[in-house]
């Protein structure tokens, strides 16, 4: 999946990421841009507008939780399926999340990283992260197959 150089670039860069901010923004943007994903978060309260979503404390907290799991996954780039097995089971068997949503969130995360880091998020680094989010999405969807 990733070369040793790509792994080093991804994990090295991740140390600069403010997980709480990026996670909140990524999940918020997912819910705004793909409103059908809101059905999994109806218990989060007011999701009636983009502004309400982006300022919703439960969205922010869950976004951080999602990126905390992503951070843990970065420690296991050679075994993403193993690293995300329990989350895959939860999202498939209990929550019944459409696995396509994992791909969408990964793509949103890459956009948010680019927005936060500008030129420091180089095209090469973007390509590396795209590989990672694709791998994570596939790992999360593994239980569905």
Swiss-Prot record:
The keyword Metal-binding applies. PROSITE patterns: GLOBIN. CDD domains: Hb-beta-like. One of its GO terms (cellular component) is hemoglobin complex. The modification Phosphothreonine is found at residue 11. Keywords: Acetylation, Heme, Iron, Metal-binding, Oxygen transport, Phosphoprotein, S-nitrosylation, Transport. Pfam families: Globin. One of its GO terms (biological process) is hydrogen peroxide catabolic process. GO terms for molecular function: haptoglobin binding; heme binding; hemoglobin alpha binding; metal ion binding; organic acid binding; oxygen binding; oxygen carrier activity; peroxidase activity. The modification N6-acetyllysine is found at residues 58, 81. The modification S-nitrosocysteine is found at residue 92. Heme b binds at residues 62, 91. Residues 1-145 form the Globin domain. Involved in oxygen transport from the lung to the various peripheral tissues. Heterotetramer of two alpha chains and two beta chains. This is Hemoglobin subunit beta. It comes from Rangifer tarandus. The gene is HBB.
């Amino acid at each position: 999946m990733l070369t040793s150089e790509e792994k080093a670039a991804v994990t090295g860069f991740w140390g600069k990421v403010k997980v709480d901010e990026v996670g909140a923004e990524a999940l918020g943007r997912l819910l705004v841009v793909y409103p059908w994903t809101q059905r999994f978060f109806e218990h989060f309260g007011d999701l009636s507008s983009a502004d309400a979503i982006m300022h919703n404390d439960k969205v922010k907290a869950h976004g951080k939780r999602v990126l905390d799991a992503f951070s843990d996954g970065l420690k296991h780039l050679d075994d993403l399926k193993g690293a995300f097995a329990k989350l895959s089971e939860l999202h498939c068997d209990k929550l019944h999340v459409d696995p396509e949503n994992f791909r969408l969130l990964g793509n949103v995360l890459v956009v948010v990283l680019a927005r936060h880091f500008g030129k420091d998020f180089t095209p090469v680094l973007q390509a590396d992260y795209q590989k990672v989010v694709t791998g994570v999405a596939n790992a999360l969807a593994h239980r569905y197959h």
